[in-house]
Amino acid sequence: MSLRPLQDRILVERVQETEKTKGGIIIPDTAKEKPAEGKVVASGNGRVGEDGKLIPMDLKVGDTILFSKYGGTEVKIDGTDYLIMRQDDVLGVIE
């Protein structure tokens, strides 16, 4: 199954955080914070402005982004967890 986001939405795969600290301590899943970094895996075409013209997306597939920890809607596709969010929910692109 594949998912194509509509309008100004993007499909994001979270970047997994490390399982161990620098000192070698293993961090259990319950103690991990939700990562606020992810990779854009699909993108909509943009949104329609008040003048009726299409405003294209600034983000593209492959961009690594920073977003609010609790932003987006969680979805599971073929056993993989993703987030769907609006482009406006993205804080920045990591270059």
From Swiss-Prot:
It is found in: Cytoplasm. GO terms for molecular function: ATP binding; metal ion binding; protein folding chaperone; protein-folding chaperone binding; unfolded protein binding. It comes from the Bacteria. Together with the chaperonin GroEL, plays an essential role in assisting protein folding. The GroEL-GroES system forms a nano-cage that allows encapsulation of the non-native substrate proteins and provides a physical environment optimized to promote and accelerate protein folding. GroES binds to the apical surface of the GroEL ring, thereby capping the opening of the GroEL channel. This is Co-chaperonin GroES. InterPro entries: Chaperonin_GroES (IPR020818), Chaperonin_GroES_sf (IPR037124), Chaprnonin_Cpn10_CS (IPR018369), GroES-like_sf (IPR011032). GO terms for cellular component: cytoplasm. It comes from Desulforapulum autotrophicum (strain ATCC 43914 / DSM 3382 / VKM B-1955 / HRM2). Its main location: cytoplasm. GO terms for biological process: chaperone cofactor-dependent protein refolding. Belongs to the GroES chaperonin family.
